[in-house]
């Protein structure tokens, strides 16, 4: 494959902003039981063995230039207003500050399998070049001996362990380590269902006969390589395309499932539902019999909850005995607005700027390897423009089975007013450098950093956030005026932050969990510290208490 003309784009977007100018647990069970049954307490919500296993919950694998873990779940900065000019500047992320777990796992390239720890080039660039069939640097494939703890000799795989946990996991003389004992409990399905979800970093897991992948983001497929041979991988059709044609996993192991259809897999009824996260993202519903009674499990993967989920025939008016919940934003401060509002605001802002000047405007939208395409598409349609992407991104998008998006793409950056790029951040200085590449075609540039961390609630909403009634009755709204520029923006170069997320907001989580008949909720994100778990348990218990006392929330006349 020929060398990409815009291969230096990553360098542009790693620069910091120095500009001076400014722009205008498990929740208590609520199944039908004897009225004298007392709800579980927070203290007993998580067992000590579960807490021990949670140390392995963060699989930080920066692959495919995909910041899905670091920018959405930890290291992306929040923002605060600067003076009275409605400008934003970075604010230290309180969630990161309070998080006690500092997991640092061994990073492996999913294509060639080498360790990425000692590369002199950016790890993301190396992986991207591997995807394009090129290698940026000759490196040894031999892993560091002190970076891996081997499992049972009968299991040919190894699994990465953080330095802080290594000593505690070294086997005693004559003892073997059971791989299953170090897999986070929330990745293993209950009721003797022999399935694991998003658990590819642990080799062959004892008792697991099938592996499920919720979506194609690196914090979920981490550990999966072309050499995978530990069992069938069940996923959506789009995710299957990506595994086979992008990651080159052996097709015999990839089992692509259609949405909304029942499958009998090893005696378990399985449904795949659209998770409303990134293209191909899936929620899994598992149904099994236990003591002649149906037990139903919902694993949400990463999802943006919506009314469509609650009203789905597979879930509507059903008892969901266990829900494995994406708790990325289980905090009242993250009651950010609906996707559609933010997408429209971004498009309206681009139109307003375009109409206010005779300049040739270039719009840059930050995306993941997959995900957040909706923003770029809306802007492109509003400007009657095509969308430029690099060859690697083009190849990935062609696996998504979205012909409308494919028809908008071009590999000529001068023929598109919208550029969709994968990067770690957008700042005025880096945008200026990017503009200089194409100064013969464009003379003004704006960029959008789209992430839920950017949302700042109104003061009165923050004060009312402790009331469930207030949360339910005050759905967040968002318009063009609410878009704020990052400090350092000028008339020529401006960077905006938009509270667009493909994870559920706190409002979404509240509506979802109050309107469904849920037995137990098991968080799958931010479970690495006792403090974080206790904070989440407060809300899980409040939701459960409300369901028990007031019944399920009706969505009949709710616009959500």
UniProtKB/Swiss-Prot annotation:
InterPro entries: DRMBL, Rad18_UBZ4, RibonucZ/Hydroxyglut_hydro
Domain of life of the source: Eukaryota
Keyword Zinc found: yes
Subcellular location: Nucleus
GO biological process, one term: double-strand break repair via nonhomologous end joining
Family: Belongs to the DNA repair metallo-beta-lactamase (DRMBL) family.
Name of the protein: DNA cross-link repair protein pso2/snm1
Lineage, highest ranks first: Eukaryota, Fungi, Dikarya, Ascomycota, Taphrinomycotina
């Amino acid at each position: 494959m020929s060398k990409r003309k815009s291969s230096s784009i990553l360098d542009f977007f790693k620069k910091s902003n120095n500009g001076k100018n400014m722009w205008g647990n498990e929740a208590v069970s609520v199944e039908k039981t004897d009225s004298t049954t007392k709800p579980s307490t927070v203290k007993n919500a998580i067992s000590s063995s579960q807490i021990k296993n949670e140390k392995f919950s963060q699989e930080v694998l920066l692959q495919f230039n995909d910041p899905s873990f670091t920018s959405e779940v930890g290291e992306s900065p929040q923002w605060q207003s600067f003076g009275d000019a409605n400008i934003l500047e970075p604010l230290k992320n309180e969630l990161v500050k309070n998080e006690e777990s500092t997991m640092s796992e061994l990073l492996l390239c999913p294509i060639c399998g080498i360790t990425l720890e000692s590369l002199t080039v950016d790890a993301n660039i190396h992986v991207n070049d591997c995807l394009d069939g090129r290698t940026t640097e000759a490196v040894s494939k031999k892993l560091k001996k002190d970076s891996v703890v081997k499992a049972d000799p009968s299991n040919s795989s190894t699994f990465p362990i953080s330095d802080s946990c290594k000593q505690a996991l070294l086997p005693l003389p004559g003892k073997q380590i059971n791989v299953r004992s170090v897999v986070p409990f929330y990745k293993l399905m209950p009721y003797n269902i022999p399935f694991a979800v998003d658990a590819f970093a642990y080799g062959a897991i004892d008792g697991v006969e099938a592996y499920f992948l919720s979506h194609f983001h690196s914090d979920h497929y981490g550990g999966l390589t072309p050499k995978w041979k530990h069992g069938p991988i069940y996923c959506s059709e789009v995710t299957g395309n990506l595994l086979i044609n992008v990651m080159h996993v052996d097709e015999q192991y990839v089992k692509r499932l259609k949405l909304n259809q029942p499958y009998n897999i090893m005696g378990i009824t399985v449904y795949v539902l659209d998770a409303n996260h990134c293209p191909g993202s899936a929620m899994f519903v598992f149904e099994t019999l236990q003591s002649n009674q149906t037990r139903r499990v919902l694993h949400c993967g990463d999802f943006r909850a919506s009314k469509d989920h609650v009203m789905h025939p597979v879930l509507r008016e059903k008892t969901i005995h266990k829900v494995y919940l994406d708790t990325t934003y289980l905090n009242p401060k993250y009651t950010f607005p609906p996707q559609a509002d933010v997408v429209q605001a971004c498009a309206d802002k681009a139109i307003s700027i375009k109409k206010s000047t005779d300049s040739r405007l270039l719009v840059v939208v930050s995306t993941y390897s997959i995900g957040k395409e909706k923003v770029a598409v809306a802007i492109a349609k509003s400007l009657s423009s095509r969308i430029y992407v690099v060859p690697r991104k083009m190849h990935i998008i062609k696996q998504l089975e979205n012909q409308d998006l494919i028809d908008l793409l071009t590999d000529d950056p001068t023929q598109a007013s919208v550029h969709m790029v994968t990067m770690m951040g957008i700042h005025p200085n880096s945008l200026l450098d990017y503009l200089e590449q194409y100064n013969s075609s464009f003379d003004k540039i704006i960029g959008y950093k789209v992430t839920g961390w950017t949302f700042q609630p109104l003061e009165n909403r923050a004060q009312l956030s402790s009331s469930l009634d207030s949360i339910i009755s005050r759905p967040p709204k968002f318009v063009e005026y609410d878009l704020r520029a990052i400090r350092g923006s000028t008339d020529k170069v401006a960077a905006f932050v938009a509270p667009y997320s493909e994870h559920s907001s706190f409002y979404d989580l509240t509506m979802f969990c109050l309107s469904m008949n849920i037995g137990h909720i098991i968080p799958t994100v931010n479970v690495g510290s006792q403090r974080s778990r206790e904070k989440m348990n407060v809300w899980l218990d409040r939701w459960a208490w409300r369901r028990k006392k007031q019944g399920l929330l009706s969505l009949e006349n709710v616009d959500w």
